[in-house]
Amino acid sequence: MLLRQPTTVTEAQECMAQGAVPVGGATLVWATWQRDGFPDLAMSLRGLPEATAVEPESLGAAVVLHRIDDRVPEVLRRAAGSVGTGAVRRTATVGGNLVGSSLRCLLPAALVLDARATVLGPDQPYETDLAEVVAKRHLLLGLRWRTPVASGYRKQPAEAGGPPPLVVATAVHVDGEGRHRLRVAVREGYDVLSETAGCDAGPDETLDALERTDLGALPAGARDVVREQVADILGPRAGR
């Protein structure tokens, strides 16, 4: 297998045109290749500046998870810190987790940040939503978002080898008219749900609104965790 490491977007597009298969931190991809055979040509984005940035409102797809620190919002930092072991976080990448892994541990955090994805198309990079990236498995260059007012993250304990643990991510944003909106994303099993509700009226009213969305159909235990997380993030705002 020949591995190329482009340092510009143009070089990366040339690699794509030649049929190069992206390789990064998704260990499941390596396992598949070991079983089925390695591709003739692969490419890594770790030499591409657009894919290696760690900034307050952007994160590159080739960033390994252990590099995600307090430069990014709390919800994303805590999501990255909860993935696997230290050894896993030193090799797993943002793009590998979101596109190459069935668990997609970072997806709830990215959804509540209302993150937009920059992907590498055949002609030029373009921006799209996370749903398209996950569904079509695009070559991800990075994520961008607006800094939230507050954010939170909770991952329930789980037994090794069992089903994926419940994840609840939250973030409060200010819309164009100055109103506060709460975004909540839940990973239940392999499914991820995301909903939004106004939150200026307080936790109780916000929870009532969320119960009328698809989140209201979650199992009772998952709804309890959602309620706790909503109370945690909105409680300090009560009375403001």
Tell what function each PLM region has.
Residues 1-240:
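C-terminal structural segment of proteins
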